[in-house]
Curated annotation (Swiss-Prot):
Name of protein: Uracil-DNA glycosylase
Gene Ontology terms, MF aspect: uracil DNA N-glycosylase activity
SUPFAM superfamilies given in the database record: Uracil-DNA glycosylase-like
Region feature (Disordered): 1-63, 79-104
Basic residues bias: start-end ranges: 1-17
Domain of life: Viruses
Reported impact of residue 126 to L: In strain: Nonneuroinvasive mutant HF10
Effect of residue 38 to I: In strain: Nonneuroinvasive mutant HF10
Gene3D superfamilies: Uracil-DNA glycosylase-like domain (3.40.470.10)
EC number(s) per entry: 3.2.2.27
Enzyme class: hydrolase
Record's catalysed reaction(s): Hydrolyzes single-stranded DNA or mismatched double-stranded DNA and polynucleotides, releasing free uracil
GO cellular component, one term: host cell nucleus
Length: 334
């Protein structure tokens, strides 16, 4: 079928300089929200106080995956926060620097599922990633950051996207970048916020595009997209966690590799999915086969994007595609 929304703006360059200091009024400079393609500066002054010498976390140094998952389950008790320590530099996992303790044995699915409250229906798509030594390294780094900084969303919401629909119920996949970095917003679904939180700018543009496609769609005024998730829309960020007040701060600890593996298995298992890829990040991170799936591309819904997102017809095109395959369309009301 023809893709009505394949136009994409020129790629944005991610700034290589350190994060800019926000104005005194606390407003991040040129930043709409945490899901926008160009990460902005933190508008929260707190950073972490690191215990000890800042070396490898105890779980990573001890008895391997079992101790690592036990440490994650125990949680960051007694962690304090101050504004004295500098932010962590990005971590690059491409150098193969995985500790021997982290690679001693595959991670156990049952424990992993219990720690993160993952729905067991996702086991065939996620368990193969646990055999990859880089996943142990990822979780060790996640655990270390939980001990030294405030990580969003809460651990019980990192994989909440697995609890709304099973892999066999997914009809549409919408790819985001990383969670919102202000407290009370992120809850594990890309672009979505909790029901008591006003929609951030990018999400407002998404909902406006829905209204343009379906004027009769009901909009409740909040930005919680759980209804979409229960209806078979997988709202998945390529990075599942973030440091409070620091957009893209966890973008290089390895979540993208983990999420990419899950998406590849889902795409192989479920031909005929609709993928909505908004912005160059999503389009470069996830590349489904357009001969097998309906792949829709458009600019990011950020107010900073060159192409206004309100003209995007993805929600209409997605339903038409599903109907051609005798699949029930999505009710995009919120």
């Amino acid at each position: 079928m023809k893709r009505a929304c394949s136009r994409s703006p020129s790629p944005r360059r991610r700034p290589s300089s350190p994060r800019r200091t926000p104005p005194r009024d606390g407003t991040p400079p040129q930043k709409a929200d945490a899901d926008d393609p160009t990460p902005g500066a933190s508008n929260d002054a707190s950073t972490e106080t690191r215990p000890g010498s800042g070396g490898e976390p105890a779980a990573c140094r001890s008895s391997g995956p079992a101790a690592l998952l036990a440490a994650l389950e125990a949680g960051p008790a007694g962690v304090t926060f101050s504004s004295s320590a500098p932010p962590d530099p990005p971590m690059d996992l491409t150098n193969g620097g995985v500790s021997p303790a982290a690679t001693s044995a595959p991670l156990d699915w049952t424990t992993f599922r219990r720690v993160f409250l993952i729905d067991d229906a996702w086991r065939p798509l996620m368990e193969p990633e646990l055999a990859n030594p880089l996943t142990a390294h990822l979780l060790a780094e996640y655990n270390r950051r939980c001990q030294t900084e405030e990580v969003l969303p809460p651990r019980e919401d990192v994989f909440s996207w697995t609890r709304y629909c099973t892999p066999d119920e997914v009809r549409v996949v919408i790819i985001g970048q990383d969670p919102y970095h202000h407290p009370g917003q992120a809850h594990g679904l890309a672009f979505s916020v909790r029901a008591n939180v006003p929609p951030p700018p990018s999400l407002r543009n998404v909902l406006a595009a829905v209204k343009n496609c379906y004027p009769e769609a009901r909009m409740s005024g909040h930005g919680c997209l759980e209804k979409w998730a229960r209806d078979g829309v997988l709202l998945l960020n390529t990075t599942l966690t973030v440091k409070r007040g620091a957009a893209a701060s966890h973008s290089r600890i390895g979540w993208d590799r983990f999420v990419g593996g899950v998406i590849r298995r889902l795409a192989a298992r479920r031909p005929g999915l609709v993928f909505m890829l908004w912005g160059t990040h999503a389009q470069n991170a996830i590349r489904p086969d357009p001969r097998v799936h309906c792949v829709l591309k458009f600019s990011h819904p950020s107010p900073l994007s060159k192409v206004p997102f309100g003209t995007c017809q993805h929600f209409l095109v997605a339903n038409r595609y599903l109907e051609t395959r005798s699949i029930s369309p999505i009710d995009w009301s919120v």
